[in-house]
Amino acid sequence: MEAIRILIAFAAFMGFKLYQMDVKSEFLNGDLKEEVFVKQPPGFEDAELPDHVFRLNKALYGLKQAPRACYERMSKFLLKKSFKRGKIDNTMFLLKREQELLIIQVYVDDIIFGATSEHLCE
């Protein structure tokens, strides 16, 4: 949360707009590093196999591993797009192009970003 406050203060100082995005579907795309099993959800129980459990292939919203899987997927994407990870805060990503700067702050499934030039935000 402190990193977000710093970004807001920096954006105000630099005079650039901030944008916010909520990426709920990102939780459904994160890969899991370990095997995770869940019990049958209410209303979907198999009467013949009441104790059957399911192994998840992807992260599921509400799963304790979901935020980390989400962050790792988003981080890989941003690094492939030439962003640099923040040295002090690894949830901040920077993209410099000549005299322009784009800053992205990732907080669980929320993204706050702003730039010295609006065309970088597009």
PLM features per residue range, with description:
Residues 1-122:
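Long, low-complexity, charge-biased intrinsically disordered regions
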